[in-house]
Every structure is written in C-alpha cells, then in structure tokens.
C-alpha cells in the first residue's frame, strides 16, 4: 500500500530573492506582517496536507521501474513505496517592485524535506527550497481609479538536494536525476495549482489601507502623478 503523510512546522527565517528592486524594509514590514498573519490564520501550511502526493509517487514509480528492474531485478510495486513531506517551514516574506515598475511581487519562501522509500533502495531524503511568487498588477478603471489585480502566481524551485552522508549505491545514482526532475515538476505544477487560489483569496481580502499603501508605492515608483 502507498504510504503518504505530511508533517509541518513554522520557522521564522530569512530566504529572500536578491534584487535591486527591493522595497525599503520600513515600508514593506507592515504589509509582510499582515500577509504572514493571514497565512497563519488561514492555516496555509496545513493546506499542503491536501496535496496529492500519491500522484507524485506513482509518477516516480512509473519512471524508475524499468531501470530498476534492469539493475536489481523485478521487485518494485506500489506496496513497496512510501513518500511523505517533513519539516515544512514558512520563511520571511518579502516584497519587491516588478521589473517594469507596474506592480509588486510578493515572495513567499518555503523549505521542506521529502522522504522517499522505494523497496530495497535505501530511504532518500531530499531537501527542497522553493519560492512562491505572487504578482500584483496596478490597473485603472474608466474613471481613472487605481486598484491592485492578482496577476501570475507560480512556484519556483530554488534547490532540490539529496541529504545523505553515505556514498550512494549504483541503483540510487541511476534514478536520482529522474526523481529530482519529477519532484521539480510536481512543485511547479501540482503544488502551485493547490496553493495559488488560497493566496489569491488572501490578497483579495487585505486591509484597504494596506492596499492603498501598495498602490501609492507603485505610483511613486513609476512616477505617476495622481490627483486625489
């Protein structure tokens, strides 16, 4: 039987993208604090528990079974596999201006470990760092009033690294790249599809004053004159 499980913790840390477009901390702290509190109040990390890891495990099994059968003989089946997420951490959020100065990018960094067991292979633990990038775009209506619109939302894997203090066996070396690629695709596609709608809802319900502050930041950055 497939074994799928998740374990979550919160970590106050720092993992932000390096960019010359960073908003000054004294300006962005109020906004990132509100967003972080919204994520916690909305049990954002627990939403990962609903992500279908069984689909990821089946994908990995489909892709590595043939090669493992050649290397170690026919021995792999669904009942011989286990996958689980461990030690998921929400790190320090950050804001930056979009490159065209017409919006704001919210960066939500996550860290997690993926435990994977494929029958006789030694258990693997892969350390993952990924950023969720949420783009807020400045738009104006027919009356010239500005608003923030939820733009593109994506997960960008920063690193997928095997945690192992011992030399890897030949079978593990042979399939490691395939496993890492499958995990990267899962993060980009499935994880993003599961988490981005929640982020859209969170941003849509931000305090009006915070939204106005963001709009003013973008307008100032773009040197747009606004008559109130």
From Swiss-Prot:
* Transmembrane residue ranges: none
* Signal peptide extent: 1-20
Keyword Signal assigned to the entry: answer is yes
- Tell me a GO biological process for this protein: surfactant homeostasis
Q: Where in the cell is it found?
A: Secreted
Q: Which cysteines are joined by disulfide bonds?
A: 153-196
**Key word Transit peptide present:** no
What is the reported tissue distribution? Found in sweat (at protein level).
Q: How is it modified after translation?
A: No sign of N-X-[ST] acceptor site even though reported as N-glycosylated.
**Assigned keywords, A-Z:** Allergen, Disulfide bond, Glycoprotein, Secreted, Signal
Pfam families documented for this protein: LBP_BPI_CETP
Give the family, as the similarity comment puts it. Belongs to the BPI/LBP/Plunc superfamily. Plunc family.
Functional description taken from the UniProt entry: Major protein in sweat, has surfactant properties. Has a role in temperature regulation by having a capacity to make hydrophobic surfaces wettable and so can function in promoting spreading and evaporation of sweat.
Q: What is this protein called?
A: Latherin
């Amino acid at each position: 039987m497939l074994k799928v499980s998740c374990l979550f913790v919160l970590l106050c840390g720092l993992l932000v993208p390096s960019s010359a477009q960073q908003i000054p901390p004294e300006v962005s702290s109020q906004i990132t604090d509100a967003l972080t509190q919204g994520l916690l109040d909305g049990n954002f990390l627990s939403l990962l528990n609903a992500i279908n890891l069984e689909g990821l495990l089946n994908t990995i099994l489909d892709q590595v079974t043939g090669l493992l059968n050649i290397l170690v003989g026919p021995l792999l089946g669904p009942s011989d596999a286990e996958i689980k997420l461990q030690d998921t951490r929400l790190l320090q959020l950050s804001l930056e201006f979009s490159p065209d100065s017409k919006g704001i990018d919210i960066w939500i960094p996550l860290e997690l470990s993926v435990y994977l067991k494929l029958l006789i292979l030694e258990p693997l633990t892969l350390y993952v760092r990924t950023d969720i990038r949420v783009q807020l775009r400045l738009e104006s209506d027919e009356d010239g009033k500005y608003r923030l619109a939820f733009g593109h939302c994506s997960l960008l894997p920063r690193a997928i690294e095997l945690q192992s203090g011992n030399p890897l066996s030949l079978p593990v070396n042979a399939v490691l790249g395939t496993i890492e690629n499958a995990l990267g695709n899962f993060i980009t596609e499935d994880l993003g599809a599961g988490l981005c709608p929640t982020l859209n809802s969170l941003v849509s319900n931000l305090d009006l004053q915070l939204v106005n502050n963001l709009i003013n930041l973008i307008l100032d950055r773009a040197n747009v004159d606004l008559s109130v």
